[in-house]
C-alpha cells in the first residue's frame, strides 16, 4: 500500500550516503560540543 511505499522511500533516504554523512557530522558536532569523542558514545 501507500504506507509501505512511503516506508520504503524513507528507508532508502535514511540509508543513503548523504544522510549517513550528515548523521556522522551531526554526531561529531554534538560530541565536540559535549567534549567527548564519538567513539566513546
UniProtKB/Swiss-Prot annotation:
Any one Gene Ontology BP term: hemolysis in another organism
Keywords: Antibiotic, Antimicrobial, Cytolysis, Hemolysis, Secreted
Tissue-by-tissue expression: Expressed by the venom gland.
GO cellular component, one term: extracellular region
Record flagged with keyword Protease: no
Cellular location(s): Secreted
Superkingdom of this protein's organism: Eukaryota
A Pfam family this chain is assigned to: Antimicrobial_7
Record carries keyword Secreted: yes
Record function comment: Antimicrobial activity against S.typhimurium, K.pneumoniae, E.cloacae, P.aeruginosa, E.coli and S.marcescens. Also shows hemolytic activity when tested in human erythrocytes.
Entry's family note: Belongs to the non-disulfide-bridged peptide (NDBP) superfamily. Long chain multifunctional peptide (group 2) family.
Name of the protein described by the UniProt record: Hadrurin
Amino acid at each position: 500500500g501507500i504506507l509501505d511505499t512511503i516506508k520504503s522511500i524513507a528507508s532508502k533516504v535514511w540509508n543513503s550516503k548523504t544522510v549517513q554523512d550528515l548523521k556522522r557530522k551531526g554526531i561529531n558536532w554534538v560530541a565536540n560540543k559535549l567534549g567527548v569523542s564519538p567513539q566513546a558514545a
